[in-house]
Amino acid sequence: KLKKQILAKALLIGEDFRFGNNREFGINDLLKSNIEIFILKEVRKNNKRVSSTHIRKALSSGDLNLAKSLLGRDYCISGKVVHGDQRGREIGFPTANIHMFHNRPPIKGVFAVKLNEEFGVANLGTRPTVTGISKLHLEVHVLNFSKDLYGQHVHITFLKKIRDEVKFES
């Protein structure tokens, strides 16, 4: 059943891997699922264990350098460019609105980014200036760029946090 739910033939997991509600399932449960399992040994960086929890904390605090050190690469999000409400375009700063495949990224704010290979500025958050919106949005203004990206799958690399989101009065 699990193999059908997660659509995986193999999983790469850590020695202390747990999953499910309240982390109730472990490696032995996976072994029963006929999914090939590869177990990684613990990785340490600066005498501290590297874990997804540690990485998420670094990201949520805006420490992209620590996250990069732990991941071995810059933090990235992929998604598809979709039509937005054109507000950025109306004020001279068109944005690529990204439908994120991961709907709860551990990172929020305004960032210097690369969209594929082009530099830009991204806002990832709830857009507090736009009233009545609580869903997370990722939108990127690509510098000196005018190509049509609608429908394309893009890769956003987070380079530096500029600031938290701010609600503007006008």
Describe each region flagged by the PLM.
Residues 1-94, 169:
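Classical nucleotidyltransferase
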